[in-house]
Regions:
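Short linear sequence motifs
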Residues: 1, 9, 13, 69-71, ...
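Short amphipathic alpha-helical surface micro-motifs
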Residues: 1-3, 30-34, 56-59
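Short glycine-/aliphatic-rich beta-strand segments at the starts of folded cytosolic domains
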Residues: 6-22
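Low-complexity, compositionally biased segments
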Residues: 7, 18, 27-30, 50, ...
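Charged, amphipathic alpha-helical regulatory modules used
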Residues: 11, 23-44, 80-91
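Short loop or secondary-structure boundary microenvironments that flank
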Residues: 21-24, 53
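Short, intrinsically disordered low-complexity segments
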Residues: 38-82, 86-87
């Protein structure tokens, strides 16, 4: 089976730990608004959130990348179907 470079998870809701450093205040505010709103997140620190949503890991990554500049950094952690924790570094 050829690899398609997608991150799969069979869970209906996905739980993530997201930590980020985004310099642009508008983009940072948009990410915080996503975490607090539709992503159903709980603030751990101003730059770290626990979120639970229906986005797949690929969709989550694309949504975060859209808000990041060249010097920004983000990492998220998620649990896979096999109960393994994965860390994805962005930026």
């Amino acid at each position: 089976m050829p690899r398609d470079n997608r991150l799969y998870s069979g869970f209906v809701n996905h739980d993530y730990i997201l930590t980020f450093s985004i310099a642009d205040e508008a983009n940072r505010a948009r990410l915080v608004a996503l975490c607090a709103g539709p992503w159903q997140g709980d603030e751990v620190t101003p730059d770290t959130w626990e979120v639970s949503n229906t986005l797949s890991p690929d969709q989550m990554e694309r949504a975060i990348l859209e808000l990041m500049g060249d010097a920004d950094r983000a990492a998220y952690y998620y649990l896979s179907d096999s109960k393994r924790m994965f860390r994805v570094l962005l930026g």
